[in-house]
From Swiss-Prot:
DNA-binding region per Swiss-Prot/TrEMBL record: 204-223
Protein name: Global transcriptional regulator CodY
Gene3D superfamilies given in the database record: 3.30.450.40, Winged helix-like DNA-binding domain superfamily/Winged helix DNA-binding domain
Keywords (A to Z) from UniProt: Cytoplasm, DNA-binding, Repressor, Transcription, Transcription regulation
Length: 258
């Protein structure tokens, strides 16, 4: 069995999870690092580190700080990555650190390969590989470009799932608002003006006096929102009622009504 085939099959095992379970970017980085003996990084379009694995014995405090602590590459370096629309293989560091502010690199024989991650004709991120003293072969590049395609598909799926989730949350809020009477809607607007954020303490009697409505109107409005799952509330007795927004679309939709 060829080395490329065995490596590809190992990668495919990551993909053979349940259909609804997303492929972890970290798993792909770990596998690439193991089979290619390299550092592997998956970076979003905005430079956020989505997954990474360092090869054994890798010692670069500058890179570890960016990846582990900051979890983000510098903007200027990320812009350089985004300039490339095709694979750039076996780039020598020529004694310089990839981060301009660092200057000289302690490792003189570092070799990097940059692979764009593209989905639906849109740049989604970058797959970066780096190792020392040994160039990436054509078989290696076949594997990493295949990996970049997989990552692109997963990024698109994540974006689509997020869009669907946001749409669902918005629809739930709109339905909840639609169940309110005019006076209940007026009460809700004043409630969240008083909260001035996603959570806080509400004294229903104060709002009732201020708006000129009964306390029961406020209670009914809160019950409807709680039943819809857009807020949670907890009575604190004489202190009032603690309210927390569970659906972040609620405040946006209330602003639109105003």
């Amino acid at each position: 069995m060829s080395s490329l085939l065995s490596k590809t099959r190992r990668l495919n095992k990551i993909l053979q999870k349940t259909g609804t379970e997303p492929v972890a970017f970290q798993d792909i980085c770990t596998l690439l690092s193991e089979v290619l003996e390299c550092n592997a990084y998956i970076v979003s379009k905005r430079g956020k580190v989505l997954g990474y694995t360092f090869s054994p014995g890798f010692e670069c405090e500058a890179m570890k700080k960016k990846v582990i602590e900051d979890k983000k590459f510098p903007e200027d370096y990320n812009l350089t990555l985004l300039e490339s629309n095709e694979t750039l293989a076996n780039l020598s560091n020529q004694g310089r650190c990839v981060f301009a502010e660092i200057g000289d690199c302690k490792t003189k024989d570092k070799i990097s390969t940059i692979i764009p991650i593209i989905g639906s004709r849109e740049r989604l991120g970058t797959l970066i590989l780096a190792r020392f003293g040994k160039e990436f072969t054509d078989d290696d590049l076949v594997l990493v470009e295949y990996s970049a395609t997989i990552v692109g598909m997963e990024m698109l799926r994540a974006l689509q799932e997020d869009l669907a989730d946001q749409t669902r949350k918005k629809a739930v809020v709109q339905l909840a608002i639609g169940t309110l009477s005019y006076s209940e809607l007026e009460a809700v607007e004043h409630i969240f003006e008083e909260l001035n954020g996603n959570e806080g303490l509400l004294v229903a009697s104060k709002i009732a006096d201020k708006v000129g409505i009964t306390r029961s109107v406020i209670v009914n409005a809160l019950r409807k929102f709680e039943s819809a799952g857009v807020i949670e509330s907890r009575s604190l007795g004489m202190k009032g009622t603690y309210i927390r927004v569970l659906n972040e679309k609620l405040l946006d939709e209330l602003k639109k009504i105003k």
